[in-house]
Structures are given as C-alpha cells and as structure tokens.
A protein has these predicted regions:
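Short, flexible loop segments at boundaries between secondary-structure elements
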Residues: 2-6, 142-171
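Redox- and metal-dependent alpha/beta enzyme cores, enriched for Fe-S-associated oxidoreductases
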Residues: 38-111
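Structural motif
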Residues: 33-34, 58, 119-121
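A short, acidic, amphipathic alpha-helical segment used as a generic capping/interface helix at domain edges
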Residues: 100-118, 130-136
Length: 171
C-alpha cells in the first residue's frame, strides 16, 4: 500500500487552527515538544503537517486498533509506512480503539505522563472518534498542547454503505 492508496480528499485548506482553538504562542524555545499523530488511511497528511514545524519534534503515532474492520490497522500502518520510516517512530506506535474517543484521550494522557515536560502538537488526521478525543484532551489541557489540522476538502463519493452508529457522552 502506498501513502496515496486512499484519496479521500481532493485538496487541503492548509494548516490553521480549528475554530476556537487558535493559540497565540506555542511552546517556549527551551521546551521540548512531541508531534502526536492519530493516523488514518491518507498517509501524506501527518507528514504534510509535521513539515510545517521547525525543527520537527519527536513523533509518537497513534493507530486505531482494534479498527472498525479487522484489517484497518494494518492498512493504516501500510499507508503511513513512509512517514513512520522517515521519522523513525515505528517502535513508538501507540494504540487506541478506532471507534473510541475516550481511548484516544487516554492515549494522550499516557503520553503526557511519559513525557511530562513536553509540549504536544496533536494532529487528529485519523478517525473521527480519535479527533473527538483529541479535541476533548486539548480543551482540558490547553496549556501544554495544541491541535494542528490541515482542513481537507473531501472527495465526493468517498465512502458508501452503513455501519454501526456510535453515541458518546462527554458530560
């Protein structure tokens, strides 16, 4: 599988904050940083985002496993093979159930516990539940993280069929 096996987006609006998540300043010059990427099928998205950071921080990827289907985690890793190799982060892959924003949140909390002095750049370019967990984490921990998003313009007719509906309560 290549990074472009799944063309789910026709273009990208560029790296800019999500509404309500703009930050005037990132980490201080002496504060170490991590790039935490929730990976999906579009293997070029995480690399496009990290290439905007100077210098590129250490990468910790998160893969949705178990996935929505049994083969999806393997497809995700295959589609991100170049990114994982370029940033030498295969051994740092973390897992969070693809359909669970709470596991995504906990994965970020675990990374923060492992790297308590690091600023987290979070790229939610994987599943929507992972994006929800990342946003929830950013709301609760705004002083040491920020969301980086590339605003994809979706391909028409990119998916078909129906699946299980997931309902979450964040109260």
């Amino acid at each position: 599988a290549s990074a472009n096996l799944f063309d789910l987006s026709i273009s990208f609006g560029g790296l800019s904050p999500l509404p309500g998540f703009a930050k005037l300043s990132g980490p201080s010059d002496d504060e170490p940083a991590l790039f935490v990427a929730f990976l999906g099928f579009e293997g070029n998205r995480a690399e496009r985002i990290i290439n905007q950071l100077e210098p590129p921080p250490r990468v910790i990827p998160i893969v949705g496993a178990p996935g929505f289907q049994i083969n999806y985690p393997a497809i995700t890793v295959a589609c991100n093979r170049a990114f994982l190799g370029d940033f030498d982060c295969n051994s740092d892959i973390r897992l969070a159930k693809a359909s669970c924003p709470f596991e995504a949140y906990e994965a970020l909390a675990s990374i923060r516990r492992d790297f308590p002095d690091h600023y987290l750049y979070i790229a939610p370019v994987g599943t929507r539940p992972h994006a929800l967990g990342a946003i929830r984490y950013a709301i609760a921990n705004e002083s040491h993280c920020e969301i980086l998003f590339d605003h994809p313009v979706r391909q028409s007719n990119r998916t078909n069929g129906r699946g299980i509906i997931h309902v979450f309560s964040f109260i």
